[in-house]
Amino acid sequence: MVAEHQASPANVRVKRIAGALGAEVLGLNCAKTLSGADVGALHRALTDHLVVSLPDQTMSLDDLERLTDQLGGRMVTPFVKALDDRPYVIRVLKERADKLNFANAWHSDLTYLPEPPSFTLLYAHEVPDYGGDTLFQNQYLAYETLSDGLKQTLRGLRAVHSAGAAYGTGGYLDQVKQHMSTPVAPSPDAFKEVVHPIVVTHPESGKPALFVNPVYTVRIEGWSHGESQALLQYLYKHGLNENFTCRVRWAKGTLTIWDNRATQHNALNDYAGQRREMYRTSVAGAAPKAA
């Protein structure tokens, strides 16, 4: 269903941060329950810009969970240990002595699930003096700028997704977890596979988007590993063009929300010796539909 564009409340101001995607949203106080009109304005900004950053928020974890519910409802993040008393909230933490950070690779969140999240919320509690930005990429543009012939080919294909390489027993995060402060929980369950269309239709904008990413997309259904990698690596190289990206620079109190159905992101690890503490929730989504 294509979202209707209605006038935003007078208190809400939206300012683009890059040409490809991303906007700053001003005038909302997320420490309070947002009105229906304000939620609608925030949702429209997400539909239009895919990534929205709300600076100078003073939010509790109750506030973060309430806003998550207002945007569609909470969901659990597998293979990452949640806070003891909050099963839907994870702490993304890098201590000063840590060499590695969490999510330092291009990916879309939880695409290894049958129903990946629609949105992700990330709130900055403590940030380094410099560095620690997050890069975002527009999967609409990644698809739109392909040739007509390749677009047609991709519309008939599905890809296999799995968390095994990242979160499986013996996988990357299992091997390096002692060097990270974000508590991961590797499991043999991470090797389970799901299949999604390579090109999906966004349920609100109605636009087609690529739906593959280097971390969780394993292969193309029915293709060999070599055949799959040849095409997938081309799509990654094409889609991760810097002209399709934006950068969010964090400050204490920044809340950033992104549309996981049409973006990838990458958390930079360029702040050695400094501490960064963030809190993250995910909004429940639906099974991706083929374009």
For each of these PLM feature ranges, what is it?
Residues V2-L255, N260-A291:
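Non-heme Fe(II) oxygenase catalytic core, chiefly the N-lobe of the double-stranded beta-helix
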